[in-house]
């Protein structure tokens, strides 16, 4: 058996179905308890001068191994389990010993063990990326198969070692390489590893979705359905896997799902088939192109209808309530059938723009006669034009999406791996790029964003390095617009409604303004709502920028870290806080009559520490 009794090896090399998280961080899932016990039971070697070369290799006792080899031990000689010294060094990640044995003539691709594996196979099973890199640099062949018929990339997939998968593919290993059964890595992932990864990770490398294996002629989608792997089915459908290919039994993926009686997968496949069938109709394709516009129009009409019902000439609030319930029921049907799930995230944006539209119409139609010629009117017009401009700039400007070509991605992966930096702190497994400082992957936009602040619901856009300053002005002018409409509402009531606030109090006053103009009260409530959240966010943003020098994401992350630490972290004492004036100058990229000069940093390509000449501080990621 390969590697019995060693604390730093995987003792079970079978390839059955594995639970989610199997093999992550370089440790096999089934290894956890057995390996922990083995490590505890493994005795310490007090005197290494008498141990044999196999044990010395396992423990990484370099001097003892060197002594025995120079005394005449053949490094190619396998032990009684048919395992070479290079295998033992590889599985225990003994880099210095591997270099030494290879220099003494060890065969880098020597087969050994029960599974007839190479040292590279053993290193991959354990997730030892540095060892994999070293063996490949010394000529190891990643295309060789072991006794189970798996090559290097298949083992990396089965054990869910994503960094090794990325490195092998970047070094030229085909993502569509087949094992002895004609199965690609994507097929093995969909069938053997329950969960979204590494199926989703493999799809980043554009594997063939519709290739079939030799024996069953199943596609990756067939294998995912056969295993009941819901996450893999979802990933493959999203990537565009065919629903019509039949296997050797003449079964489509839906036929297999029906046979297995997996109701969730059946629903997913039928829904996807219906959506793809609708794509054939020109009207449906036109509706998809106009989804956002239709969503906006629906929101505008719905908000008008709500106000119309409230302003309806009837004293029966029961009738108005029934009409409102009916309205919301009817309008909820439209997004469900005509607007895709991905575009529903723009619903708050449509609500905001619809609110501003009716705010403007109310001001122009109802409030204009009372405020015509006054400076408040022109201030309102300026505020709403500025709001629309900065909303557009916030939405249309690239927030700082990090981009890289396929070749650049592979070069980055190789560079990071060979420098020991290929981990989740510096590498994005979704974008396959090196992450700049202060960046974060947004799962809504599906991209890494430089100097990430948040994904704003109200703009439907990420807020980052490229559009953060526009976002501040967007909040400011939205607060101004809502503030003017609140002021205009009270001016309107004082001019057009008979109120007795001083005589009868607040409750009577509210009844009087509701009876006078429910529409104006409705618009006031909308304006008050938008004024509240926009003003709160504006003040919060300005505080973070001027006094902390942090983004919203960084502030929240530091606060979470502080909860798990004995000593409370100070948000003011961060490398990014350069003082009130310098923080503002850096953020808005403007000086102050030569007293303060901004430091220009391109956060989309900033991977190392930054030296700030103004304060002689070193900026680091938080």
From Swiss-Prot:
PROSITE patterns with a match to the protein in the record: ANK_REP_REGION, ANK_REPEAT, DHHC
Residue numbers bearing the N-acetylmethionine modification: 1
GO molecular function: magnesium ion transmembrane transporter activity; palmitoyltransferase activity; protein-cysteine S-palmitoyltransferase activity
Pfam families named among the record's database cross-references: Ank_2, DHHC
Keyword Cell membrane appears in the UniProt entry: no
EC number(s) stated in the UniProt entry for this protein: 2.3.1.225
Active-site residues per Swiss-Prot or TrEMBL entry: 456
InterPro entries, per database record: Ankyrin_rpt (IPR002110), Ankyrin_rpt-contain_sf (IPR036770), Palmitoyltrfase_DHHC (IPR001594)
EC class: transferase
Transmembrane segments annotated in the record for this chain: 292-312, 321-341, 348-368, 371-391, 471-491, 519-539
Catalytic activities: L-cysteinyl-[protein] + hexadecanoyl-CoA = S-hexadecanoyl-L-cysteinyl-[protein] + CoA
Signal peptide: none
Sequence ranges of the ANK repeats: 43-78, 81-110, 115-144, 148-177, 181-211, 216-245, 249-277
Intracellular or extracellular location(s): Golgi apparatus membrane; Cytoplasmic vesicle membrane
Domain annotation DHHC: ranges: 426-476
GO cellular component: a single term: Golgi apparatus
Subunit structure as annotated in this protein's UniProt entry: Interacts (via ANK repeats) with CLIP3. Interacts (via ANK repeats) with DNAJC5 (via C-terminus). Interacts (via ANK repeats) with HTT. Interacts (via ANK repeats) with MAP6. Interacts (via ANK repeats) with SNAP23. Interacts (via ANK repeats) with SNAP25. May interact (via ANK repeats) with SPRED2.
Role description: Palmitoyltransferase that could catalyze the addition of palmitate onto various protein substrates. Palmitoyltransferase for HTT and GAD2. May play a role in Mg(2+) transport.
Family to which the UniProt record says this protein belongs: Belongs to the DHHC palmitoyltransferase family. AKR/ZDHHC17 subfamily.
Protein name: Palmitoyltransferase ZDHHC13
Underlying gene: ZDHHC13
């Amino acid at each position: 058996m390969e590697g019995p009794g060693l604390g730093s090896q995987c003792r079970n090399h079978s390839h059955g179905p594995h639970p989610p998280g199997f093999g992550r961080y370089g440790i096999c899932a089934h290894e956890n308890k057995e390996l922990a016990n083995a490590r505890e039971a493994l005795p310490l070697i007090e005197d290494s001068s008498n141990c044999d070369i196999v044990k010395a290799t396992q423990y990484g006792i370099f001097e003892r191994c060197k002594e025995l080899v120079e005394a005449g031990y053949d490094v190619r000689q396998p032990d009684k389990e048919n395992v070479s010294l290079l295998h033992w060094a590889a599985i225990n990640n003994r880099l210095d010993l591997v270099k030494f044995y290879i220099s003494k003539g060890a065969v880098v691709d020597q087969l050994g063990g029960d599974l007839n594996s190479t040292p590279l196979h053993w290193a991959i099973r354990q997730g030892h990326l540095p060892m994999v890199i070293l063996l490949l640099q010394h000529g190891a062949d990643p295309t060789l198969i072991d006794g189970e018929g798996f090559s290097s990339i298949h083992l990396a997939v089965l054990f869910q070692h994503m960094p090794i998968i990325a490195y092998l593919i970047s070094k030229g290993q085909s993502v569509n390489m087949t094992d002895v059964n004609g199965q690609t890595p994507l097929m093995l992932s969909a069938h053997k590893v329950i969960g979204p990864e590494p199926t989703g990770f493999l799809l980043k490398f554009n594997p063939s979705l519709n290739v079939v294996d030799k024996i069953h002629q199943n596609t990756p989608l067939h294998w995912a359905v056969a295993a009941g792997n819901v996450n893999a089915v979802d990933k493959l459908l999203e990537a565009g896997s065919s629903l019509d290919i039949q296997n050797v039994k003449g079964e489509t993926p839906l036929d297999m799902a029906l046979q297995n009686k997996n109701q969730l997968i059946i629903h997913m496949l039928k829904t996807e088939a219906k959506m793809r069938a609708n794509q054939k109709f020109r009207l449906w394709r036109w509706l998809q192109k106009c989804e956002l516009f239709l969503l906006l129009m629906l929101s505008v009409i719905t908000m008008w209808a709500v106000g119309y019902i409230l302003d309806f000439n009837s004293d029966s609030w029961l009738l108005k309530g029934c009409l409102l319930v009916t309205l919301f029921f009817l309008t909820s049907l439209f997004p469900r059938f005509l607007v895709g799930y991905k575009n529903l995230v723009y619903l708050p944006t449509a609500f905001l723009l619809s609110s501003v539209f009716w705010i403007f119409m109310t001001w122009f139609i109802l409030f204009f006669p009372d405020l015509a010629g006054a400076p408040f009117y022109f201030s309102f017009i300026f505020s709403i034009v500025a709001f629309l401009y900065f909303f557009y700039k916030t939405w249309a400007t690239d927030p700082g999406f990090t981009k890289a070509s396929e070749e650049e991605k592979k070069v980055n992966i190789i560079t990071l791996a060979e420098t020991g930096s290929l981990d989740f702190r510096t590498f994005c497994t979704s974008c396959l790029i090196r992450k700049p400082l202060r960046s974060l992957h947004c799962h809504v936009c599906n991209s890494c964003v430089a100097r990430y602040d948040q994904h704003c619901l109200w703009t439907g856009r990420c807020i980052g390095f490229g559009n953060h300053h526009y976002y501040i002005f967007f909040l400011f002018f939205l607060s101004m617009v809502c503030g003017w409409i609140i002021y205009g509402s009270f001016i309107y009531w004082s001019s057009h409604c008979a109120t007795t606030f001083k005589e009868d109090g607040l409750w009577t006053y509210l009844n009087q303004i509701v009876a006078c103009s429910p529409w104006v009260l409705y618009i006031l409530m909308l304006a008050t709502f938008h004024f509240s959240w926009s003003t709160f966010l504006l003040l919060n943003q300005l505080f973070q920028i001027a006094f902390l020098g942090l983004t919203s994401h960084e502030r929240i992350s530091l606060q979470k870290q502080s909860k798990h630490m004995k000593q409370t972290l100070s948000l003011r004492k961060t490398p990014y806080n350069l003082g009130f004036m310098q923080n503002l100058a850096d953020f808005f990229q403007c000086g102050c009559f030569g007293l303060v000069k901004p430091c220009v940093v391109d956060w989309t390509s900033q991977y190392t520490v930054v030296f700030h000449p103004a304060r002689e501080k070193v900026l680091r990621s938080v």
